[in-house]
A protein has these predicted regions:
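C-terminal and inter-domain tail/linker signature
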Residues: 1-123
């Protein structure tokens, strides 16, 4: 049975809350995510910015899609984009569209200001 738009939005809200500010263990990620690309992305970002946060400013749902507008916050503690750890706190705006299937995130499309993040790391 597929989720309603409201239920899909609630699922993404729970996902963001569960993963933000703590270690993203495989068990935790697998609970919410069936998209292998997103799971790999989470692992890569977690390695560079342990316990990073995704803060949703807006969540909009329609059908099986949920759009999130918000911000990434983290502390640079591992290599990222060829940059050695700096210990700097960084933030950058982002937008993600999630497709929900079988009560999990099945696909995602990420729009992220990587230039803003790299600029903060190089200052």
């Amino acid at each position: 049975m597929s989720l309603t738009s409201t239920e899909s939005k609630q699922l993404v809200g729970r996902y963001l809350q569960a993963l933000s500010g703590q270690s993203k263990t495989p068990e935790l990620v697998d609970h919410f995510v069936s998209d292998a690309g997103l799971a790999a992305h989470i692992r890569d970002v977690e390695a560079a910015f342990p316990e990073y946060e995704l803060i949703a400013e807006t969540l909009i749902a329609e059908g099986d899609l949920v759009a999130m507008h918000g911000a990434f916050h983290g502390v640079h503690r591992g290599p990222f984009a060829g940059i050695a750890p700096t210990g700097r706190s960084v933030s950058a705006p982002l937008m993600i569209i999630y497709r929900i299937a079988n009560e999990r995130i099945a696909e995602h499309w990420l729009h992220f200001d990587g230039t803003a993040l790299v600029t903060q790391l190089q200052q």
